[in-house]
Amino acid sequence: MKLVLIFLIINFLLIINCENLIKVLDVRLAQTHIIPIEGKTWNLKNKTQHMSIIGNRRALLLASFEDLNKSYYVSIWLDNKIIGSLELKDPSQLPQTEDNGERYSTKHHSVLLPKEWIRPNMKIKFTLTESKDNSSLNIDSSNFFYPDVSQDYTLKMWTLPFYLFGANDTNTQPFSVTNGIGSEITKELMERWSCSDIIAVNHPIQRIDWPYLVMEPRNGNPAMLITNSDQKKDGYAIMNGVLNILTEIREAFGESTSSIQIYSPLLHLGANGKYTNPGGGLGGGSRGTGDHKYTFTFFHEQGHAMGLPHAGEAFAAGSYPYVNGSLLGSEWGYDANHNELLGTFIPPTSDQFKNCRRNSVFDSKGRCVKQSVMQGGAGDYSSKYRYSMFADFEMTTIQNYFKNSIYYDQTKGTYKKWNDTSKSYFEYIPSTKNNGLWGLDDGTPIERDIEVYTILFTYSTVGPKELSQIYPILKSSKGNLMKRYDPTNKNDMKLITPGSGSWYCFASGCDYTVRVTFDDDSLEHILLRQGKRKYWNPMGDFKENLYNATSSNSFILRGINVKATKSIKKVELLETLMAWKGISNATVLVSKDF
């Protein structure tokens, strides 16, 4: 009899609950953009792109109800337990639009959810009274809603200023200005980039001060050594050279497969001995360079660093959804620092507003629509801001950039990767892929946070001699060390000899070795995964154009780290053809005493 009574009571409560179910018309969450709670998906060129909510980042909850006149509460659930509850503000208190522009909505209640609540597998329920227990049978409640919350990740960025051709703190900008982006800039970047947090600090190398730069063959021009910025053959030549150096630094520090970014402010002198502006920027592959101001050039190039193309070109190719690289059709943005919504139209205090009708896309109300930051829209922002906004679609590229990276967990001393199916990190053990063809241990270091010297050098097969240089050595108090092979060690050579199962020398051969002499006359030999051979032929013919001055095959730029336990007396680049056969007949190609 008691069981029957309990059954009837439960069914009665369910009927009441169904009759009193709060009717919710729309639920959205806003971080960089206001998107549906289930995320947003695009299908372009037979490729599906999806934008999720980022975990461990605060989010503005917007909800519209059939009855606008009631007060509502939201409860956040995780593992079938309430982790928090808040009262929603009525629609009149929805955050304002930048520059007091048109309101986003007059129907949405809203509340800012703390970052600790934004986690995978969270659930949302709306009620008319505050929920303080874990009962899901509250009268006057809604169904559950299930936000698509994905990876939480911290964007780490190094800044590494380049002072070139005599540039210094006095005749250009002081290191205190160029060495980092500052907390206020970081706060605004957090509102524009899809990430949980940002750590932006000066690189362990601190800065690079070089009187010259060796430019690789480029655009039909041979390699050349330059000592002032006016000697460059094209506007991007120096910036391209800097990016190539950053590639070597990232690899030497074991960061090539990480999501760690690096940006280098470029300060150099012209032929007149005065500062010359770089005249733009260049970025890609987790690297960027440009001027020292950390404004639109920096913002644009770091978009490239995370994999974003120029939006106009992408639209023309069918891989960007909004006309001419604009934001027409993109969701509105949100800035939690200012607690205001960002329309997709150019605000009146923007420098671009006055003349925007000359070349803008217009919305249905005749307003000038913002362009993507990646297509000339870097200035389409309210005067209170430093940066404009990306399109919602571009956040998918940024999110994927982080999903595909390897992360080092400093607290555990282990690596991890993200599983987008389970919505969780898993411990990852780096391994050597493709038998070492493209490197060892997923490009991760074998030692961390030790004092290192970074040695960067160039070599030209055709000369003149000045093109083969060992740059001034750089020292870091906290650097990383990569696994390497010593060509004087027979056991090491057995591991990479062609035919042993290793493909370490199959990309272009193993024909070069760096020899470092320390102040106690001890030696260290580091075999480079670099050679003169054709692909997949480590003992065969030399590459085409190996001795063509205008071909990149005639030029080498490489960088390595070595332990800084002793001072360096000399660095040499040796020609060690098929090094696994022995290097007793090595030829010294480049040598420099320190």
Curated annotation (Swiss-Prot):
One of its GO terms (biological process) is proteolysis. Keywords: Hydrolase, Metal-binding, Metalloprotease, Protease, Secreted, Signal, Zinc. It is an enzyme of class 3 (hydrolase). Its cofactor is Zn(2+). The active site is at residue 301. The keyword Membrane does not apply. One of its GO terms (molecular function) is metal ion binding. Residues 147-408 form the Peptidase M66 domain. Residues 1-18 form the signal peptide. Zn(2+) binds at residues 300, 304, 310. GO terms for cellular component: extracellular region. It is found in: Secreted. Binds 1 zinc ion per subunit. Its EC number is 3.4.24.-. PANTHER family: DICTOMALLEIN-1-RELATED, PTHR39540. Belongs to the dictomallein family. This is Dictomallein-4. It comes from Dictyostelium discoideum. The gene is dtmlD.
